[in-house]
């Protein structure tokens, strides 16, 4: 029964893979990807700094020292 159900699924998946990318998914713009990566890095850095400062200023860290 499993084989009977898995064969049509396999055929559909193979047809989707062999079809190729859609026209809208053509070549991605490298500069926009780099800009998004840079923006992600900046926001991650800001959030990490906020967390570190919050930990430094918290009473719990002062009590454990």
UniProtKB/Swiss-Prot annotation:
This protein's gene is called APOC1B
Q: Name one GO molecular function term.
A: phospholipase inhibitor activity
Q: Specify whether Iron is a keyword of the entry.
A: no
A GO cellular component entry from the record: very-low-density lipoprotein particle
Provide the taxonomic classification: Eukaryota, Metazoa, Chordata, Craniata, Vertebrata
Please give the organism.
Pongo abelii
Where does it mainly reside?
A: secreted
Among Gene3D superfamilies, the record links this protein to: Apolipoprotein C-I
First and last residue of the signal peptide: 1-26
Q: What subcellular compartments does it reside in? A: Secreted
Q: Which UniProt keywords apply?
A: Lipid transport, Secreted, Signal, Transport
Is the keyword Transport in the record?
A: yes
Which family does the entry's similarity section mention?
Belongs to the apolipoprotein C1 family.
Q: Which residues cross the membrane?
A: none
Name of protein:
Apolipoprotein C-I, basic form
Per the record, the domain of life is: Eukaryota
- What else does the entry mention about this protein? Apolipoprotein C-I is present in acidic (APOC1A) and basic (APOC1B) forms in P.paniscus, P.abelii and P.troglodytes and perhaps also in baboons and macaques. The two genes for ApoC-I arose through a duplication process that occurred after the divergence of New World monkeys from the human lineage. In human, the acidic form has become a pseudogene sometime between the divergence of bonobos and chimpanzees from the human lineage and the appearance of the Denisovans. Pseudogenization resulted when the codon for the penultimate amino acid in the signal sequence was changed to a stop codon.
Q: What is any one GO biological process for this UniProt entry? A: lipoprotein metabolic process
